[in-house]
Amino acid sequence: MGKDGEGDKKRETMAVMSLMKDQQNPIQQFQVKFKEIETGFKSWLSKQKLPVEAAVVTAMGGVQGAFIGGLMGTLSPEMPQAGIDPQAMASLKQTQALVGGPLVQARNFAAITGVNAGIACVMKRIRGKEDLESAVVAAFGSGVAYSLVSAGLQGQPMNAITTAAGFAVFQGVFFKLGERFSKPSVEDPYYTRGRSMLLKLGLEKYEKNFKKGLLADPTLPLLTDSALRDVSIPPGPRLLILDHIQRDPELKGKRGSRG
């Protein structure tokens, strides 16, 4: 009889969960799934050795840059080169990142974004933070890479240095402006486990309810239907949350030890 009752409860919970997922916006479902994959990938990548992480980040940045560059090259006309002074060709080639054909722009943007992402990754791993110095060094490196792929070895060294310095200055200015005008959202460490639970259940929109009721992570083993009702969480989500806590070995153990 006990097993039948437990089976009925499980089927009821699964039915409620299925209903909640059906009612969830498809775009929201995709965002949640993408966030889970992104978080898992970043967690895996952070555990790899520095050369592996740098190579993966550089490759991803290069692919992203190539896609953007190819798209821009498709939408913009290619600059004609007939009758141009050969001495000015190196400088002209460097200006074609924004006016060249799809392949030219894809190559140039791949070099810029790939090298920038790779150097920034290495700097962050070594220094343990993202700061102005890391941003400037990454931008300088991407400027050198851009000069090499756009003008080749025939380009004058001073042009490459000037271009790289320009990249570094612009990146430094944008970094400081970003620090001034943007306030990065810092996740509250007291709600980490609750946030993860709600994300798994597709109920992340109720995180504000948890914070409003001060239902921090230490209170999770003590949660009751009435406590969730007091913070205006509907019956369906309440069932899912309580069932999740009941199935979590660690939370269930704490709940039993307090009872």
Swiss-Prot record:
Pfam families: SAM_1 (PF00536), Tim17 (PF02466). Its main location: mitochondrion. It is a multi-pass membrane protein. It is found in: Mitochondrion membrane; Plastid, Chloroplast inner membrane. GO terms for biological process: mitochondrion organization; protein insertion into mitochondrial inner membrane; protein targeting to chloroplast; tRNA import into mitochondrion. One of its GO terms (cellular component) is chloroplast. Keywords: Chloroplast, Membrane, Mitochondrion, Plastid, Plastid inner membrane, Protein transport, Transmembrane, Transmembrane helix, Transport. The chain crosses the membrane at residues 55-75, 108-124, 135-155, 158-178. Disruption phenotype: Plants lacking both HP30-1 and HP30-2 are yellow to pale-green and impaired import of CEQORH in chloroplast inner membranes. Belongs to the Tim17/Tim22/Tim23 family. Together with HP30-1 and HP20, triggers the import and insertion of transit sequence-less multi-pass transmembrane proteins (e.g. CEQORH) into the chloroplastic inner membrane. Probable component of a protein-conducting channel made of HP30-1, HP30-2 and HP20 that mediates the import of transit sequence-less proteins into the chloroplastic inner membrane. Interacts with CEQORH. PANTHER family: CHLOROPLASTIC IMPORT INNER MEMBRANE TRANSLOCASE SUBUNIT HP30-2 (PTHR14110:SF29), MITOCHONDRIAL IMPORT INNER MEMBRANE TRANSLOCASE SUBUNIT TIM22 (PTHR14110). This is Chloroplastic import inner membrane translocase subunit HP30-2. It comes from Arabidopsis thaliana.
